[in-house]
Amino acid sequence: MVAVLQSTLPIIFSMEFIMGTLGNGFIFLIVCIDWVQRRKISLVDQIRTALAISRIALIWLIFLDWWVSVHYPALHETGKMLSTYLISWTVINHCNFWLTANLSILYFLKIANFSNIIFLYLKFRSKNVVLVTLLVSLFFLFLNTVIIKIFSDVCFDSVQRNVSQIFIMYNHEQICKFLSFTNPMFTFIPFVMSTVMFSLLIFSLWRHLKNMQHTAKGCRDISTTVHIRALQTIIVSVVLYTIFFLSFFVKVWSFVSPERYLIFLFVWALGNAVFSAHPFVMILVNRRLRLASLSLIFWLWYRFKNIEV
């Protein structure tokens, strides 16, 4: 079991690194090309671009941390290195969750059909809603960063006073357990927001289909198609981030033996697969990104075919 996990982990981390960089990089490239051609960029594309950049940064950070831990374990164990990684990971992960939540909010405001006066007020001020949400998230980011900084400094100061290997491992275990509590606590709010937006979109689609029965029974109109595509994007986000949250709770259980530590790394890799898998869902759901990806595939196929000939 241990040997299998040891041989599997490098493959998983490498695949996540390659696929995540390619998927998010492709979204960033297509949005930028479209921005240059049209001389303007929509709010949805702005969030997609920021989300792609933050995910690329997070994937590279995770991969570099794993690479340093394998090739330079002494450097990886230093307090300054770990503290820098923890804060960097917290900031970038925070951006990922809140940008995803804002994308869900934007889908809901643009697509859903409600006659409620509050909804209509927010619908025509969707940009302000996104900006206010991001500003509010900065408070949680500041609070989370300060808590992690204080806790990590206390632990690393203790390590400097007691440099025994057992004590160092104990401190690292306590830090990981602490993060497994604080990070889900601070990222649970955007997760709930995405889940609520998903539920409201389902309700909006149900009402729309009910109204359609009186006009064009059995016919799928544009609004229905848009609802379904938005729901596909959000539900995948909710499912993937649920896996991400579950991975944190498994980490608390895993710090008992070396075998369980490998399980911790394996679950950690699966949890971070969220940032590599979700961009491909966004590409498949979005018509413009899907057509661009098909064009790229056909172009590559044509180039390789000519090379072989």
From Swiss-Prot:
Segments on the Extracellular face: 1-10, 77-80, 149-185, 251-262
Signal peptide feature range: none
Molecular function terms, GO-annotated: bitter taste receptor activity; G protein-coupled receptor activity
Glycosylation-annotated residues: 162
Pfam family of the protein (one): TAS2R
Keywords: G-protein coupled receptor, Glycoprotein, Membrane, Receptor, Sensory transduction, Taste, Transducer, Transmembrane, Transmembrane helix
UniProt lineage: Eukaryota, Metazoa, Chordata, Craniata, Vertebrata
Subcellular localization, as worded in the UniProt entry: Membrane
Designated name of the protein: Taste receptor type 2 member 113
Keyword Membrane found: yes
Function: Putative taste receptor which may play a role in the perception of bitterness.
Gene3D superfamilies cross-referenced by the UniProt entry: Rhodopsin 7-helix transmembrane proteins
Major localization listed first in the record, in broad terms: membrane
Cytoplasmic side: 32-55, 102-127, 207-229, 284-309
